Amino acid sequence: MKHDIKIENKSLEMMISEKGYISKLSMKDDPYKMNWVIEEAYLSQAGYQDADKLFGYFDITADSKQRNSREFSPVIEKEGAEITVTYDFGNMKIIMIYDMGKNDGELHWTIHLVNQEKKDIWISDFGVWISFAYVMFRDKEVLRNIHNSAAVFSSISDNYTKLNAVRRDNRGGNLGFYQVEGEALSIGTYCDYENLFFENVSPSLDGMLFHKLYFAGGYPEGFQNKDWIYKKDGFMLKAEEDRTWKYVVNINRNQEEFLEKGLKLNHPKVDYTPLNIIGETARLTVEVSESLKILSAEALFKENDTVKSLSIEVKYEGEMYHLSYKPTALGEHKAVIKFSDGTKDFVVMNVMDKLDRVIDERVAYICDELYEGKEGNPPFAFKPVSNQGESLGKLNLVLKKNLLGSLDVDQVRKVEKSAVEYVRPKWFKDGDFKKPRKLYGDFYRCMDFEYIGHLFYLLSEFDDQILELYTADTYLEWAADVFELRVNPDLHEDERGKEESQMLGVYFLYFEDLLIKLKEKELTEKMQTIQSLWDKMMDRVHRGADSYAAAITEHFYDNAGFGPAAGALSVSKKRESAEKYGELLLANIGYSNDFRAQNPDRWWEALSYMTHSLWGGLTAAAAYKVFSYLQNTEFLEGSYRATAGVLYCYDTHATAVTPLKKGMAVSTYAVAGPHINRPDLSRDRFGQAAFYRDGGIFARLFDSDDQTPDWDMGEEMTAYLDSFGQKTFIINNKGTLRVINGSYEETETGYKITSFAPYSRDFYYISEDGMTLLERQGDGRSVVLQIRR
């Protein structure tokens, strides 16, 4: 009987299966004994048929012939702290060398593709599985999903591809993976999962993503999409050529250390503004090792179906390079940096229209195109119709825009009509807020009620002369009644209702405002009831913070659980538990050289690593709440990174994805390219109904695959308008200025800061002395700072 072969150094331990894949990769001092690669044993135990996707397996198409690592038993040799795995296909040989002895504390992985013939071979597809432990375990012991699973944040680059596998607890150490030789095209993902949503069990979803590193191709023959940013080419392997790729794996504690260790491996350390507004200056800073210098930089963008370029100004001061330019076109911009050794790096930034215009166009589209009116089926609904409360988020966005921006009475009244004539009778028998309808066969979802409560609360914010069916005070009482139904287990008869009512949700966004208004209107009994229920819930969540019970929802691990928990605990000023859940948020929000890959980690709506507009935005909102309480700028920066990706779902000027009509929006952006489950969805925006044709649960959730792709959008933008929709932050870190949600220009005596907020109200200055609200200047869209440069 053969056994796995082991190599180790002082920090890492690795085992190679006799089949040639990495069966174990672990940190020696890890108290949780996490295996950083997906295990064949777990796949078998959970019933997943994916043993062909384990770390180190590969697929290659050479001269149109498909081969893979499972066809032959490899030759495996060990010498000291090095293992060599060789696959010999006759005309080609693939050699993988795993070396733990080159630099203590690191794994060095070399891949050789050798042409053994005296003629060229065309490689149209070559991908190697790098299946880090991106797993949502089917385990109600949520600590397993926190301490033994990782999010994977990747940066694809010509010569500097890297990723960080981030343990979900954000405390136990992460694994960085850096390219140090060769060129990778992309990292794709394959998703496998089990979803028992309709079987009335909770949690009902588990699954995993397998990551695949591509050196050639990745897509079906002849495949085309709108993505002009990333390569999909094959390459010619010359006669007797030995083409080589090298990677280094090491341990880091956080994002900063991940980037610093990259710098030591000659990776440029690039900081950039993920979201930019047309006409304002876009900025990057680049720190490099002593051996590198920047020769030039340019911004590539697509205009009228043609990729164009714009020169980027490069200055060197303060031991780093400062790059800046003013974009002249809307859409994605690929800023390419060329170095003195012939290598290249790049970042992908977005350039959007003014955001108040984006929101105005979106709200007009909702009211003009999606509102069904009296003759609709059902009457007064907004398309697309759904039983899930998330579908009402667009109504809340309409109301919020009309509270902060220009008032359109007709828009408000359409929403009011829908709330009274469609929402109330659909979700509640005879409109009685104590009698929820079982819209899902034999159960209802308590989570639906938090969106309805918010809807009624926002209606209560309008003057009575704007409303036409009921008074603002009536809507306030309705909001309180629905909120109580959402959080009071005693109002539910079945176990599912009692259990779900005690789960946190998006209502943390408006709970404080609701209480304040109830107090103002002297609705004392309702206020006290809700306050008491809230206090009980928060005490329970606070006491149970060590077990992280709130991280489980309908899914075995969910940012829709720990995000609201962190936000709500911050609202309740429970510092210790807010910090605990806050760590899960920091480990959940990505960082990358592509603004679209900085999303809060989530996969099930897209079957890929993705930006999910609703829960990306609500996770960003939760991080913002934590920042507001703890004053830790990591949460502020994470919240804004996530927000930039969410706004991409509303961007009708994007050029690298399927275009949208003015005012349209799409709930999901799949980060992966390729999306191996559905290559046609690679690096594109779409709604979940796109999976209808695949059958299974999606055929039960949706009526067809042409339903509008924005069914669950809106609540996240309502949350955005309460934070970055109005606020801009200026961070002075030892004389280096950074603006979150804005841009700056240098003046003779300081800086002029311009906000990107659609309804700019407040500028905050953050330095070693703390955070200060600056005095309002002019129209509130900009401030001048008189500080020494």
Regions found by a protein language model. Give the residues of each.
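Acidic-aromatic substrate-binding/catalytic surfaces of carbohydrate-active enzymes
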Residues: 2-86, 136-139, 143, 147-153, ...
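Catalytic cores of extracellular degradative/oxidative enzymes
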Residues: 354-624
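Terminal, non-catalytic domain-edge segments
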Residues: 256-276, 532, 536, 540, ...
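Extended acidic/polar, glycine-enriched regions
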Residues: 290-358
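Low-complexity, acidic Ser/Thr/Pro/Gly-rich terminal tails and inter-domain linkers that flank the onset
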Residues: 83-103, 253-273
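Acidic (Asp/Glu-rich), glycine- and aromatic
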Residues: 88-92, 101-162, 343
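Low-complexity, Pro/Ser/Thr- and charge-rich linker/hinge segments at domain boundaries
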Residues: 136-140, 261, 266-281, 344-380
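Short Pro-Gly-centered flexible turn/kink motifs
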Residues: 235-253, 774-787
